Amino acid sequence: MFKRKSTAELAAQMAKLAGNKGGFSSEDKGEWKLKLDNAGNGQAVIRFLPSKNDEQAPFAILVNHGFKKNGKWYIENCSSTHGDYDSCPVCQYISKNDLYNTDNKEYGLVKRKTSYWANILVVKDPAAPENEGKVFKYRFGKKIWDKINAMIAVDVEMGETPVDVTCPWEGANFVLKVKQVSGFSNYDESKFLNQSAIPNIDDESFQKELFEQMVDLSEMTSKDKFKSFEELSTKFSQVMGTAAMGGAAATAAKKADKVADDLDAFNVDDFNTKTEDDFMSSSSGSSSSADDTDLDDLLNDL
């Protein structure tokens, strides 16, 4: 059941999580999402809940890569969730090609994406009142994550008091406000309210009811949820095509593709109607030398 925990313990758990940035999990019915109106605005009151396991943090961090290229999708969990950047073909592709510094567009497409997960109690949901009083998984971004951290990482010397927002007795409700700003969802007005206990939390039967609705978030990041490097590499190559080779190999492959396209476009009928004089005149000049140079370059690249 629920136990009181120190804010220092929560701070240590969150710091450990932050070191292993983690983002993909498929859609499931246990996830709560704020319903927005036609203008893209919405609000609700939620309560972040503690972990089901006292030894684990009340949050989970997932990293994924999700993008579409050459008409194909790549959506997979990234091993950097566990601090392992070598077992992800996309991370290797980014690193080997130094995409962050050399190709901002490509980097923006394939970069790691981080999502944060928590168990929450829905306190007030005006757009879907049937959710009130129920426990769900909730996925959120860095803006809200920073607001949670700000409640813990306070300046004690200045008289500020750290708050474990997940504590059922001394935590705080969170007012989630989303507004559409320049085409994007903005969470700036979201905030924690004053510390308060969850109503009826001292009732053991109520505690049990909440506890049984919660999920073990550690299962979301367990290594059996991540595919092998070989399997991911195959998928990545299928999506990326020759670009997955990187460097000179990719350039050479593009040249080879162009040669193949040129051969496909060759008109045999035109060839059959050319006279001996046509061939003699077309062979003069520097075109033959240029073609030989291109071919040499292609072979060298390969």
UniProtKB/Swiss-Prot annotation:
User: Out of the domains of life, which is the source?
Assistant: Viruses
Question: What are the entry keywords?
Answer: DNA damage, DNA repair, DNA replication, DNA-binding, Metal-binding, Repressor, Viral DNA replication, Zinc
**Gene Ontology terms describing biological process:** bidirectional double-stranded viral DNA replication; DNA recombination; DNA repair; DNA replication
**UniProt KW Membrane keyword:** no
Ranges of biased composition (kind: Low complexity): 280-290
Supply the InterPro entries for this chain: NA-bd_OB-fold (IPR012340), Phage_T4_Gp32_ssDNA-bd (IPR012339), Phage_T4_Gp32_ssDNA-bd_sf (IPR044947), SSB_T4 (IPR046395)
Q: Where does Zn(2+) bind?
A: H65, C78, C88, C91
List the residue ranges of the region (LAST). 3-7
Q: What GO annotations for molecular function exist for this entry?
A: metal ion binding; single-stranded DNA binding
Region listing for Disordered, in residue ranges = 273-302
Share the domain note from the entry: The acidic C-terminus is involved in modulating the ssDNA binding properties. The N-terminus LAST motif is involved in the cooperative binding of the protein to ssDNA.
Q: How does it assemble?
A: Homodimer in the absence of DNA, monomer when binding DNA. Interacts with the DNA helicase assembly protein; a ternary complex between the helicase assembly protein, the single-stranded DNA-binding protein and ssDNA is an obligatory intermediate in the helicase loading mechanism. Part of the replicase complex that includes the DNA polymerase, the polymerase clamp, the clamp loader complex, the single-stranded DNA binding protein, the primase, the DnaB-like SF4 replicative helicase and the helicase assembly factor. Interacts (via C-terminus) with the viral SF1 dDA helicase.
Give the protein's biological function.
Single-stranded DNA-binding protein that participates in viral DNA replication, recombination, and repair. Coats the lagging-strand ssDNA as the replication fork advances. Stimulates the activities of viral DNA polymerase and DnaB-like SF4 replicative helicase, probably via its interaction with the helicase assembly factor. Together with DnaB-like SF4 replicative helicase and the helicase assembly factor, promotes pairing of two homologous DNA molecules containing complementary single-stranded regions and mediates homologous DNA strand exchange. Also promotes the formation of joint molecules.
**Family affiliation:** Belongs to the Tequatrovirus single-stranded DNA-binding protein family.
State what protein this is by name: Single-stranded DNA-binding protein
Name the gene for this chain. Answer: 32
